């Protein structure tokens, strides 16, 4: 058979519900409040056909620009040939969830502010707050007192017939 050109082509596993996650949607989905500027992850819920985003937006992160009674408007970057275009799409709230992509950054900002305040109140200079890669291990000496060096040599190859 030839490939169909349907909107939902190739979404058999993408839009499938998770194992043991079928049935009525939790109320927390509807009670979550979204505001303009919030970052959200688009995760299409196959149980709801209304307000479903196109498959190219599944798994993307976008910023909310409009909130209505039953849906939200989201700006998502989409690559079209060589360009990255900001696309504005309207999606129902069953298909989105708040993104956790900034939680690490916001926690780091909060901890840095606390470190700054503590240093200022103690009258000390502000410590280096930038993240650094893990440094190489420090130098150490290996003693041969109770640790005799072992001579390693390859085993001789023997043909077993």
UniProtKB/Swiss-Prot annotation:
GO CC terms, sorted: cytosolic large ribosomal subunit
PROSITE patterns reported in the protein's UniProt record: RIBOSOMAL_L21E (PS01171)
A UniProt-annotated Pfam family: Ribosomal_L21e
Gene3D superfamilies linked to this entry: 6.10.250.3260, Ribosomal protein L21
GO molecular function list: structural constituent of ribosome
GO biological process, one term: translation
Database matches in InterPro entries: Ribosomal_eL21, Ribosomal_eL21_CS, Ribosomal_eL21_sf, Translation_prot_SH3-like_sf
Protein family membership: Belongs to the eukaryotic ribosomal protein eL21 family.
Descriptive protein name: Large ribosomal subunit protein eL21
Taxonomic source organism: Caenorhabditis elegans
Gene encoding the protein: rpl-21
